[in-house]
């Protein structure tokens, strides 16, 4: 498979963006404070903002969005006898998510301002997680990817186990079992692909793996394992059950990291490994991804509609929206796959905003039950306005990023001639059910929170105050790109369209190979008693 040669970095921007927050985290225990965590808060905010600026500088100084291949490429021999190298780079698949990660993390630090219990440990974990998540998107070596993938598991586990709600131990244990257990498939697939040629030193680099002529059976086996691993993180129904429990116990900044970044790791990995490195298997598995996407959309939307717990309602809404990512990845059109990429960025912003507002509302009401929240709109008018704007973004209101990303997925899939017309019509019709349900459950949620039957005991609470400047600032920072992308999507799509076009072209070649092989088998085989070469019958 021909792919462009990587372009070497003039300056180690990506290594710096990974190592800077990790080194910053290691300094946290030595920061003097008076027990209130004021100093460490400001320190973490400065480190996260500098990391964000480093990624922005990397984009403007060393990244050309018109090029398909890897840029900002760095490769340093690490353990040569084992085939391990420090290899990082960015293309259109990774650069938008690197920027999203550093942006969301800096806002999550600001959202964590009220944290007073073990603040040093909390901000240490946020900074370490920042570097680990950037590494997931930037590394260009499959074993390094596995290490980065595992690195972000432990901060999330501790966030849930230490700062979570009443069922925090259950949620944390379930999270680590699901995610760490499924990660074994990444390691096994990576080792199998790296040692594929046999003999000599293995090579786990993406560029090397993309050029290997893996057999179709080998691809199908690796694809199956990776689909399970990445399906847990996306998540794909029925591998999703850890997510509502995790969101149900997490605090607001952890919500932002989970919804804004963690879920996108699964979508990115499906594009990077399943679609790019295993194209023949992807051509055969793609219809399954489409079906799973439809199941995600409908099942999660119906479940969200039935939820009375605010966190779980938004969690299932996230699962539903990620179904569009699956449909886009399963399509063989640049428009549909581009829509999946945009949906990941869009949902990262929208999901982070909604979950932050859930946390802010809980801090005031101390309840997550919609039945107990009625009538708080008269005391929290600005909060209601923020909720309304973010809910409209989530229900894909025209002029916001969610609308254009879902529209691209729909149009890209419906016009994709790889699939038969009846299949496209059925999938589009079923997916439309989720689009219809989303405004119903989100608008009814707003009504129940702010304009339902008044809870006199809740209304009388002195702490039922309106949004404060810090909260308004965080939501404003998220709404600006949501609206900006919605009004002018090219500002985002131009960053990755070249890489998406190249990916789709290679996958279409795989589709043609499979069709050609099937046609050859159909024409050359005939019924034969006592042999395994029986004909393939229509």
Swiss-Prot record:
<dbReference type="InterPro" id="IPR010227">
    <property type="entry name" value="NADH_Q_OxRdtase_chainM/4"/>
</dbReference>
<comment type="function">
    <text>NDH-1 shuttles electrons from NAD(P)H, via FMN and iron-sulfur (Fe-S) centers, to quinones in the respiratory chain. The immediate electron acceptor for the enzyme in this species is believed to be plastoquinone. Couples the redox reaction to proton translocation (for every two electrons transferred, four hydrogen ions are translocated across the cytoplasmic membrane), and thus conserves the redox energy in a proton gradient.</text>
</comment>
<protein>
    <recommendedName>
        <fullName>NAD(P)H-quinone oxidoreductase chain 4</fullName>
        <ecNumber>7.1.1.-</ecNumber>
    </recommendedName>
</protein>
<feature type="transmembrane region" description="Helical">
    <location>
        <begin position="382"/>
        <end position="404"/>
    </location>
</feature>
<feature type="transmembrane region" description="Helical">
    <location>
        <begin position="43"/>
        <end position="63"/>
    </location>
</feature>
<keyword id="KW-0521">NADP</keyword>
<dbReference type="GO" id="GO:0042773">
    <property type="term" value="P:ATP synthesis coupled electron transport"/>
</dbReference>
<keyword id="KW-0618">Plastoquinone</keyword>
<feature type="transmembrane region" description="Helical">
    <location>
        <begin position="472"/>
        <end position="492"/>
    </location>
</feature>
<feature type="transmembrane region" description="Helical">
    <location>
        <begin position="143"/>
        <end position="163"/>
    </location>
</feature>
<dbReference type="GO" id="GO:0031676">
    <property type="term" value="C:plasma membrane-derived thylakoid membrane"/>
</dbReference>
<dbReference type="InterPro" id="IPR022997">
    <property type="entry name" value="NADH_Q_OxRdtase_chain4"/>
</dbReference>
<keyword id="KW-1278">Translocase</keyword>
<feature type="transmembrane region" description="Helical">
    <location>
        <begin position="217"/>
        <end position="237"/>
    </location>
</feature>
<feature type="transmembrane region" description="Helical">
    <location>
        <begin position="285"/>
        <end position="305"/>
    </location>
</feature>
<dbReference type="GO" id="GO:0015990">
    <property type="term" value="P:electron transport coupled proton transport"/>
</dbReference>
<keyword id="KW-0874">Quinone</keyword>
<comment type="similarity">
    <text>Belongs to the complex I subunit 4 family.</text>
</comment>
<feature type="transmembrane region" description="Helical">
    <location>
        <begin position="251"/>
        <end position="271"/>
    </location>
</feature>
<keyword id="KW-0472">Membrane</keyword>
<keyword id="KW-1133">Transmembrane helix</keyword>
<feature type="transmembrane region" description="Helical">
    <location>
        <begin position="175"/>
        <end position="195"/>
    </location>
</feature>
<dbReference type="GO" id="GO:0008137">
    <property type="term" value="F:NADH dehydrogenase (ubiquinone) activity"/>
</dbReference>
<keyword id="KW-0812">Transmembrane</keyword>
<dbReference type="GO" id="GO:0048039">
    <property type="term" value="F:ubiquinone binding"/>
</dbReference>
<feature type="transmembrane region" description="Helical">
    <location>
        <begin position="11"/>
        <end position="31"/>
    </location>
</feature>
<keyword id="KW-0793">Thylakoid</keyword>
<feature type="transmembrane region" description="Helical">
    <location>
        <begin position="314"/>
        <end position="334"/>
    </location>
</feature>
<feature type="transmembrane region" description="Helical">
    <location>
        <begin position="340"/>
        <end position="360"/>
    </location>
</feature>
<feature type="transmembrane region" description="Helical">
    <location>
        <begin position="425"/>
        <end position="445"/>
    </location>
</feature>
<dbReference type="Pfam" id="PF00361">
    <property type="entry name" value="Proton_antipo_M"/>
</dbReference>
<feature type="transmembrane region" description="Helical">
    <location>
        <begin position="95"/>
        <end position="115"/>
    </location>
</feature>
<dbReference type="InterPro" id="IPR003918">
    <property type="entry name" value="NADH_UbQ_OxRdtase"/>
</dbReference>
<dbReference type="InterPro" id="IPR001750">
    <property type="entry name" value="ND/Mrp_TM"/>
</dbReference>
<feature type="transmembrane region" description="Helical">
    <location>
        <begin position="119"/>
        <end position="139"/>
    </location>
</feature>
<keyword id="KW-0520">NAD</keyword>
């Amino acid at each position: 498979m021909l792919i462009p040669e990587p372009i070497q970095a003039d300056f180690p921007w990506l290594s710096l963006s990974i190592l800077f927050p990790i080194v910053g985290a290691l300094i946290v225990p030595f920061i003097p404070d008076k027990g209130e965590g004021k100093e460490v808060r400001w320190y973490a905010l400065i480190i996260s903002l500098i990391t964000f600026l480093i990624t922005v500088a990397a984009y403007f100084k060393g990244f050309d969005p018109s090029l398909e291949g890897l840029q900002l490429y760095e490769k340093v021999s690490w353990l040569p006898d084992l085939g391990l190298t420090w290899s990082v780079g960015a293309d259109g698949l990774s650069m938008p998510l690197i920027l999203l990660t550093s942006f969301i993390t800096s806002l999550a630090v600001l959202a964590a301002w009220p944290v007073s219990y073990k603040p040093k440990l909390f901000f240490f974990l946020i900074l370490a997680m920042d570097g680990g998540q950037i590494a997931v998107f930037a590394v260009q070596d499959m074993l390094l990817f596995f290490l980065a993938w595992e690195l972000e598991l432990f901060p999330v586990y501790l966030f849930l186990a230490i700062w979570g709600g009443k069922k925090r131990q259950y949620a944390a244990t379930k999270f680590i079992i699901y995610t760490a257990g499924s990660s074994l498939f990444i390691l096994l697939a990576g080792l199998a692909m790296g040692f594929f040629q046999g003999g000599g030193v293995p090579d786990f680099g993406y560029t090397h793996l993309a050029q290997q002529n893996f057999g179709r059976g080998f691809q199908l086996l690796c694809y199956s394992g990776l689909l399970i691993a990445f399906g847990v993180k996306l998540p794909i129904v029925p591998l999703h059950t850890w997510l509502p429990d995790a969101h149900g116990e997490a605090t607001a900044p952890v919500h932002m990291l989970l919804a804004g970044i963690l879920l996108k790791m699964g979508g990115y990995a499906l594009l990077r490994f399943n679609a790019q490195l295993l194209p023949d298997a992807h051509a055969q598995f793609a219809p399954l991804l489409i079906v799973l996407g439809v199941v995600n959309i409908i099942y999660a939307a119906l479940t969200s509609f039935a939820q009375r717990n605010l966190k779980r309602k938004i969690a299932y809404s996230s699962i539903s929206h990620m179904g569009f990512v699956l449909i886009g990845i399963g399509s063989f059109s640049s428009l549909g796959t581009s829509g999946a990429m945009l949906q990941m960025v869009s949902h990262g912003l929208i999901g982070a905003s909604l979950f932050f507002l859930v946390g802010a509302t809980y801090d005031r009401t101390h309840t997550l039950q919609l039945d107990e929240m009625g009538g708080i709109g008269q005391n929290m008018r600005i909060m209601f306005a923020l909720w309304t704007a973010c809910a409209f973004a989530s229900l894909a209101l025209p002029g916001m990023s969610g609308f254009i990303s879902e529209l691209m997925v729909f149009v890209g899939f419906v016009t994709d001639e790889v699939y038969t017309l009846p299949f496209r019509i059925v999938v589009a019709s079923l997916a439309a059910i989720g689009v219809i349900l989303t405004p119903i459950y989100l608008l009814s949620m707003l009504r129940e929170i702010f304009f339902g039957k008044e809870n006199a005991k809740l209304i009388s609470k002195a702490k039922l105050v309106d949004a404060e400047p810090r909260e308004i600032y965080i939501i404003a920072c998220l709404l600006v790109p949501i609206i900006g992308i919605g009004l002018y999507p090219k500002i985002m799509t131009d960053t990755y369209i070249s890489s998406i076009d190249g990916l789709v072209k290679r996958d279409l070649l795989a589709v043609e190979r499979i069709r050609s092989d099937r046609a050859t088998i159909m024409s050359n085989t005939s019924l034969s008693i006592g042999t395994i070469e029986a004909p393939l019958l229509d």
